[in-house]
């Protein structure tokens, strides 16, 4: 086992991959993680609070692994710090995405299933359903209310003339208490700034940038189905292939309703490691 | 005489390394074939050889992980681009295979790359020299 930990940094350094992540923070498209690759990502959500609310910073970490070319699984760990209040661990999520169709089509569906073990202090707002997060109550109160939730999404995504267009329909059920089924949506589009790769190795070339816009928000629940009294945002998104193995993403989200924060800022850094699945299985004796 | 035998030994070694570096066991998936209209597509960059360098960069980013870096060393089940069974396919067929992938065999779709970048990949693949299959 000691041998494994000694070898791990060498293994990681030698397996750098070069794939660029899409720029969305909330919307999913139909592109899955490549089989055997592990994508490590650190991201955060913060906002400009309304009067009477407190500034918060909510980081999360993702471990995204391509099990097969049509199945991606992902583990999230998240927390948050509220200025003048406290720092708390807010829980974890395990998601799976399945792509039922083998080939590319005009519209490509993906089925999404996630289990969430969170408390009510969660602020990352990876998706917004129902009426959105409670950003007014103190952490000491919110962290004691745990929520076991099951979330499903229907992801529809198309690549059309070098544009990606994606729509997500979200249904979430809190298994811990009777809130009915909560609904939400996300949609977006993006484009690579240059569509022909230059022969030179460059970092600030347009080909290394993806830019677009996403829209997301809650749609109420079965108890109160409505777009009113929910958070809704429009958010420009941009990603930059900052080095051969890493992507930086940034998105300012602008609230469209009174229940939304005036501005949400999201940023993320992802680092992809290729072939980690097969390398680890070889390390433990499986033949290639 | 000695120089000649050294030359022959070196040539045999190079041939052996090339053959061993290839993936002669690679067999096309018979179910993985491009529709006729896709197979007939012509590479719009065929008259722009300057785009090949960008294709090489994209190849190293996206393909070399499984298919090797063009020297014929790759994962067991991945296509070896040096083999005639790959090089004999039309540009349109290779473009279609890059776009759609073969998800049952672990080849992901690369439709996330802009169309011109996928044609750049085809352009670069054509510069790889095919080696006859060992009988």
Report each predicted region and the residues it spans.
Chain A
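Bacterial N-terminal signal peptides
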Residues: 5-14
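Transmembrane beta-barrel domains of Gram-negative outer membranes and organellar outer membranes
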Residues: 19-288
């Amino acid at each position: 086992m000691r041998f494994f930990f000694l070898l791990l940094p060498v293994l990681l350094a030698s397996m750098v991959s070069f794939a660029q992540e899409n720029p969305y923070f909330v919307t999913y498209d139909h592109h899955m993680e490549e089989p055997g690759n592990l994508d490590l990502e650190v991201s955060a959500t913060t906002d400009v609070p309304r009067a009477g609310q407190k500034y918060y910073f909510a980081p999360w970490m993702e471990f995204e692994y391509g099990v097969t070319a049509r199945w991606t699984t992902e583990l999230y760990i998240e927390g948050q710090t509220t200025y003048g209040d406290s720092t708390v661990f807010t829980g974890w999520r395990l998601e799976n995405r399945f792509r039922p169709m083998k080939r590319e089509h005009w519209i490509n569906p993906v089925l999404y299933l996630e289990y969430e073990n969170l408390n009510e202090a969660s602020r990352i707002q990876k998706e917004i359903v129902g009426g959105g997060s409670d950003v007014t109550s103190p952490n000491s109160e919110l962290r004691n209310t745990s929520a076991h939730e099951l979330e499903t999404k229907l992801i529809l995504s198309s690549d059309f003339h070098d544009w990606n267009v994606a729509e997500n329909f979200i249904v979430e059920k809190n298994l811990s208490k009777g809130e009915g089924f909560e609904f939400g949506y996300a949609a977006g589009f993006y484009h690579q700034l240059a569509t022909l790769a230059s022969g030179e190795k460059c970092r600030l070339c347009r080909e290394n940038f993806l830019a677009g816009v996403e829209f997301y928000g809650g749609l109420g629940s079965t108890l109160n189905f409505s777009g009113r009294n929910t958070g809704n945002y429009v958010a420009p998104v941009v990603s930059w292939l900052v080095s051969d193995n890493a992507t930086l993403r940034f998105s300012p989200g602008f609230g469209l309703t009174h229940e939304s924060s005036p501005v949400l800022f999201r940023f993320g850094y992802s680092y992809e490691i290729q072939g980690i699945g097969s390398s680890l299985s070889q390390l433990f004796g499986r033949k290639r | 005489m000695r120089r000649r035998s050294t030359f022959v030994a070196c040539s045999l070694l190079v041939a052996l390394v090339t053959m061993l570096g290839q993936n002669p066991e690679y067999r096309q998936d018979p179910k993985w074939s491009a529709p006729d209209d896709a197979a007939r597509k012509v590479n719009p960059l065929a008259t722009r050889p300057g785009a090949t360098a960008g294709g090489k960069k994209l190849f190293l980013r996206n393909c070399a992980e499984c298919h090797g870096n063009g020297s014929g060393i790759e994962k067991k089940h991945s296509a070896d681009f040096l083999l005639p069974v790959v090089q004999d396919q039309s540009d349109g067929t290779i473009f279609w295979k890059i776009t759609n992938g073969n998800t049952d065999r672990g080849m992901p779709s690369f439709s996330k790359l802009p169309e011109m970048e996928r044609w750049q990949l085809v352009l670069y693949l054509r510069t790889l020299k095919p080696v006859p299959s060992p009988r």
